[in-house]
């Protein structure tokens, strides 16, 4: 029997705003760097009579910026008030979470509708296995992005979140995947039978969201195939087992008893406020990709790879500016940043900022190669050494200390070539009988003998002269 199966997924993505203080008090937000329950005060501990401060302006600015960059309409000249969303859990000392009405609505990102963007406060951290709660995180500002149920596969969800995190990286002042959490809403349609929506709470990685959707799609499909009914419920992701587990029946909005917070005045966003935020908005990754292709004439794939890491994109532009914008210089910058630098960073499992290299290190390296002070092979070794020593030494210092400059003495090169010819008579005979590739082997022997300090084209020239005598 033919099956027609499809899924719909919507995401509720929570990302922390990197502010110095919490959303409604002056407590610091560096909760991971201090002892438990030290960054707290009567406000974030919900002591009787403790009144919250007006919401952190930087957090509101960031919510506006995120909404704008996701194509949302900003809610202008209307009261944006905070509500109390009631539920009982050990990490929520007040018994309610303060969450705003939408700051932005009706957006679109990568073809996925954005229902709304709003602000809320993060709860504390409850560790049920130990029975302890750390309230340092309580009150940290969060931006919540609610998508429409437009995502049709686990792969689409993974790409959507990957691109969203890249956008957060460009915006700045938003903490990345390590602090991101997503609530995953999924329903399955099996042969025309539409199942109920299931929510999987607090999935804390892109990989986790992908695994949840793969598992839930199969679980719900199998239930519907047997003629069963999908329960409308909230489930938890058991990461170790890669399964989801029922927690409780799905709440409705009424279950949370939303009421306006009487301790907080509403905020009103006007056009002037939005304009101030827009002036600080960065170029989006998609716009930067397009500009790189148009301005520098590079391939779209090269642009995508470099733009994926904002630091590398900035390095590329700096290096091109220092070398000059001639086509040859742009090509060299692409090769040494997109290929070689990324290769070494990936091998060491660090990013460019962690390497502590500077753009001028890459510029100097390329200039040493184009000036024939070092060979390309030595250039690759130098870039590896620079990353290993965290940028403490420049390329010039490295090649001087290790004696890696190009051998430009023809006499020295000729001696090395003669030895290679004498030691590899079969390869020489193969070359003389028409096998051009055999010469490459002999070139390799010369390069090995000179520790990569010979220019390959010069070696080829000398070998041909000696062999054809």
From Swiss-Prot:
UniProt xrefs under PROSITE patterns: GATB
GO MF annotations in UniProt: asparaginyl-tRNA synthase (glutamine-hydrolyzing) activity; ATP binding; glutaminyl-tRNA synthase (glutamine-hydrolyzing) activity
Catalytic reactions of this protein: L-glutamyl-tRNA(Gln) + L-glutamine + ATP + H2O = L-glutaminyl-tRNA(Gln) + L-glutamate + ADP + phosphate + H(+); L-aspartyl-tRNA(Asn) + L-glutamine + ATP + H2O = L-asparaginyl-tRNA(Asn) + L-glutamate + ADP + phosphate + 2 H(+)
Its EC number(s): 6.3.5.-
Family to which this protein belongs: Belongs to the GatB/GatE family. GatB subfamily.
Name recorded for this polypeptide: Aspartyl/glutamyl-tRNA(Asn/Gln) amidotransferase subunit B
Function: Allows the formation of correctly charged Asn-tRNA(Asn) or Gln-tRNA(Gln) through the transamidation of misacylated Asp-tRNA(Asn) or Glu-tRNA(Gln) in organisms which lack either or both of asparaginyl-tRNA or glutaminyl-tRNA synthetases. The reaction takes place in the presence of glutamine and ATP through an activated phospho-Asp-tRNA(Asn) or phospho-Glu-tRNA(Gln).
């Amino acid at each position: 029997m033919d099956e027609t199966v499809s899924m719909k997924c919507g995401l509720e993505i929570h990302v922390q705003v990197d502010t110095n203080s919490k959303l409604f008090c002056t407590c610091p937000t560096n909760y991971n760097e201090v002892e438990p329950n030290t960054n707290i005060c009567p406000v974030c501990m919900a002591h009787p009579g403790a009144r919250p401060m007006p919401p952190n302006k930087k957090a509101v600015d960031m919510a506006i910026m995120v909404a704008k960059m996701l194509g949302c309409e900003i809610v202008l000249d209307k009261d944006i008030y905070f509500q109390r969303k009631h539920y009982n859990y050990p990490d929520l000392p007040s018994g309610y979470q303060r969450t705003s009405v939408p700051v932005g609505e009706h957006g679109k990102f990568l073809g996925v509708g954005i229902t709304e963007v709003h602000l809320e406060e993060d709860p504390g951290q409850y560790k049920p296995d130990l029975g302890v709660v750390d309230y340092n995180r309580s009150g940290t500002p969060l931006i919540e992005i609610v998508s429409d149920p437009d995502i049709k596969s686990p792969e689409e969800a993974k790409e959507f979140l990957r691109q969203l995190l890249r956008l957060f990286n460009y915006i700045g002042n938003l903490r990345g995947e390590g602090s991101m959490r997503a609530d995953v809403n999924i329903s399955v349609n099996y042969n025309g039978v539409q199942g109920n929506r299931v929510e999987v709470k607090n999935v804390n990685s892109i990989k986790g969201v992908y695994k949840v959707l793969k598992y839930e799609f199969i679980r719900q499909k199998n239930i519907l195939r047997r003629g069963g009914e999908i329960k409308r419920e909230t489930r938890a992701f058991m990461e170790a087992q890669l399964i989801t587990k029922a927690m409780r029946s799905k709440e409705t909005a009424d279950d949370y008893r939303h009421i306006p917070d009487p301790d907080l005045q509403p905020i009103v966003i006007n056009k002037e406020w939005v304009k101030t935020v827009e002036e600080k908005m960065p170029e989006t990754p998609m716009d930067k990709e397009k500009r790189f292709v148009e301005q520098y004439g590079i391939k779209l794939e090269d642009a995508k790879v470099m733009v994926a890491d904002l630091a590398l994109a900035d390095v590329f532009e700096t290096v091109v500016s220092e070398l000059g914008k001639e086509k040859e210089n742009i090509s060299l910058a692409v090769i040494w940043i997109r290929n070689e630098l990324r290769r070494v960073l990936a091998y060491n499992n660090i990013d460019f900022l962690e390497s502590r290299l500077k753009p001028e290190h890459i510029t100097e390296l390329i200039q040493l190669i184009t000036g024939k002070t070092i060979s390309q092979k030595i250039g690759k070794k130098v870039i590896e050494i620079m990353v290993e020593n965290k940028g403490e030494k420049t390329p010039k210092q490295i090649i001087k200390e290790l004696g890696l400059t190009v051998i430009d003495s023809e006499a020295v090169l000729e001696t090395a070539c003669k030895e290679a010819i004498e030691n590899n008579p079969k390869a020489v005979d193969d070359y003389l009988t028409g096998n051009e590739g055999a010469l490459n082997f002999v070139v390799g022997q010369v390069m090995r003998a000179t520790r990569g300090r010979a220019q390959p084209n010069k070696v080829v020239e000398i070998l041909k002269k000696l062999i054809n005598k």
